[in-house]
């Protein structure tokens, strides 16, 4: 396979660290630069626990793009920074794979239009784990037969956004196969505000944040005398790397924006 030159934004994070290791062990990936505002001017090898790579680190993406030629930006930063980075990448005509979440419908619409106008491949993935993508697909299938459903997502306590992008995407897919319905008793009252979680078209989403967790989600469907639970667990960040690899390889052949890994797997 032809060499793919990659910039990683957010190499110090746990996902970023796994992504650097992915670059090192994948023959056709070439990590040409990294972006980290705290370590501009250093090299990847200067960061604790990183492999001995001479890859330069830039303090901001704008400067990096001025000096480095790349094929793909892999962004694993925070929601706010990720939004800035993907906007800049699309405007510059640089393909990007975005692993941050928190995009609004309006932001996605604008990015989709710009990516189409610029004919630049872009993938925004709420979850890179193939198993999580299958969980979403299975939930979408089940929604045709079970109208009563709630979502519980559980993540580490350093996650900034709630609910997770995976939970939001799951509900979007479920709604495609489910008529609008308010889940629960029509006269139910929350004795404590937020006790029933977020409500999206009658589907309740509950977010758990605790140390010791990585990324987990279960979708619970209830019916007369039965219950169906679809669950996925990521026990470490290595579970996301197959999806990252697939996304980087796939985005090279795209000329538009794709939201969700489920849209690039068979």
Curated annotation (Swiss-Prot):
Keywords noted in UniProt: Amino-acid biosynthesis, Cytoplasm, Diaminopimelate biosynthesis, Lysine biosynthesis, NAD, NADP, Oxidoreductase
Positions of transmembrane segments: none
Active site: 155 (proton donor/acceptor), 159 (proton donor)
GO cellular component, one term: cytosol
Principal location class: cytoplasm
Subcellular location: Cytoplasm
Superkingdom: Bacteria
Broad class of enzyme this protein falls into: oxidoreductase
Binding positions (NADP(+)): 38
Stored InterPro entries: DapB_C, DapB_N, DapB_N_CS, DHDPR_bac, NAD(P)-bd_dom_sf
GO molecular function annotations of the record: 4-hydroxy-tetrahydrodipicolinate reductase; NAD binding; NADP binding; oxidoreductase activity, acting on CH or CH2 groups, NAD or NADP as acceptor
UniProt GO BP: diaminopimelate biosynthetic process; lysine biosynthetic process via diaminopimelate
Pathway(s) the chain acts in: Amino-acid biosynthesis; L-lysine biosynthesis via DAP pathway; (S)-tetrahydrodipicolinate from L-aspartate: step 4/4
Binding site residues for (S)-2,3,4,5-tetrahydrodipicolinate: 156, 165-166
Positions of NAD(+) binding: 10-15, 99-101, 125-128
Disulphide linkage map: none
Keyword presence, Cytoplasm: yes
Pfam families: DapB_C, DapB_N
Catalytic reactions of this protein: (S)-2,3,4,5-tetrahydrodipicolinate + NAD(+) + H2O = (2S,4S)-4-hydroxy-2,3,4,5-tetrahydrodipicolinate + NADH + H(+); (S)-2,3,4,5-tetrahydrodipicolinate + NADP(+) + H2O = (2S,4S)-4-hydroxy-2,3,4,5-tetrahydrodipicolinate + NADPH + H(+)
HAMAP family linked: DapB
Family assignment from sequence similarity: Belongs to the DapB family.
Function: Catalyzes the conversion of 4-hydroxy-tetrahydrodipicolinate (HTPA) to tetrahydrodipicolinate.
Listed name of the protein: 4-hydroxy-tetrahydrodipicolinate reductase
Taxonomic source organism: Bacillus cereus (strain AH187)
Gene name as annotated: dapB
């Amino acid at each position: 396979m032809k060499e793919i030159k990659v910039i990683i934004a957010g190499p110090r994070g746990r996902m970023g660290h796994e992504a650097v290791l992915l670059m090192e062990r994948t023959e056709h990936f070439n990590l040409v630069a990294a972006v980290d505002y705290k370590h501009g001017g250093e090299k990847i090898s200067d960061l604790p626990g990183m492999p001995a790579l001479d890859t330069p680190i830039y303090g901001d993406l704008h400067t990096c793009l001025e000096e480095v030629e790349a094929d793909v930006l892999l962004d694993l930063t925070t929601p706010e920074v990720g939004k800035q980075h993907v906007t800049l990448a699309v405007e510059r005509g640089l393909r990007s794979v975005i692993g941050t979440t928190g995009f609004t419908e309006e932001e996605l619409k604008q990015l989709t239009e710009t990516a189409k106008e610029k004919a630049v491949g872009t993938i925004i993935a709420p979850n890179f784990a193939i198993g999580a993508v299958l969980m979403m697909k299975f939930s979408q299938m089940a929604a045709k037969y079970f109208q009563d459903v709630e979502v519980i997502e559980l993540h580490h306590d350093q996650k900034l956004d709630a609910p997770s992008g995976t939970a939001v995407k799951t509900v979007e897919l479920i709604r495609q196969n489910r008529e609008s319905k308010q889940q629960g008793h029509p006269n139910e009252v929350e004795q404590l505000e937020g006790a029933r979680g977020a409500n999206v078209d009658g589907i309740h989403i509950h977010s758990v944040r605790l140390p010791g967790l990585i990324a987990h989600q279960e979708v619970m469907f209830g019916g007369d005398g039965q219950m169906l639970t679809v669950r996925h667990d990521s026990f470490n960040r290595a579970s996301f790397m197959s999806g990252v690899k697939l996304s980087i390889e796939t985005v090279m052949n795209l000329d538009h924006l794709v939201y969700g890994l489920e849209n690039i797997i068979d």
